[in-house]
Amino acid sequence: MDDFDPTVTNSPKFRLIAVQCLFSITAFAAMLSQRHGLAGPDEMTLEECGPQACGYQKFSNFKFLIAVCIIYAVFSLVVMAAYLLQRVPPPVTELTAYTVMNVLLFAAFAMSATSCNITIVDPVYPVCKRATSAKASIAFAFFTWLAVCFSMLFTYKEWRDVDYHVPGSGAYEFVPGVTSGSSRSSYPPQASSSSYA
């Protein structure tokens, strides 16, 4: 276990990932607990659910939110393990992964929030009017997405700091961290030949 580094837990970025993991777990757990109380997804299904109204199982958007939050919780645990074992991927790889998860989280939040606010029974009675757990789940999904945005900013800054470039992109000025010229930067930084003299 020589590669294990417990001091990484002091890093703001590591702690932010831990918060994201907690938020995503809370989001899918809250939605899983919403077994009734949802006034929808349509009038016919609502009648079939009975007087206690429907659970999250009747909503494809809510099930999508659960799936995305579970995936992100697992993803964040893997990332934290990589940090602890000093097996952190290059910033461009990490940024790409965060971008994909960011899109999925925002889509899950937006779709669920839309489903939560539509009206089936009457214009003043939205689907989630009495569904406290569903509303909490959607809120925590939003907080997770927002926290991931900050992780993307941290990772982008690291990308620039190490002068990383996209393989095959060439040394163009518009690529973050890469300047024009004949020399190309790499990650991790390589020792110059003069250091061996």
Curated annotation (Swiss-Prot):
Membrane spanning stretches: 14-34, 64-84, 100-120, 136-156
Start-end of Low complexity biased regions: 180-197
Compartment(s): Cell membrane
Stretch forming the signal peptide: none
InterPro entries: Marvel
Stored Pfam families: MARVEL
Entry annotated with the keyword Transmembrane: yes
Topological domains, Cytoplasmic: 1-13, 85-99, 157-197
Topology class, membrane: Multi-pass membrane protein
Region feature (Disordered): 178-197
Extracellular compartment segments: 35-63, 121-135
Family of this protein: Belongs to the Casparian strip membrane proteins (CASP) family.
Quaternary assembly: Homodimer and heterodimers.
Stated name of the protein: CASP-like protein 0U1
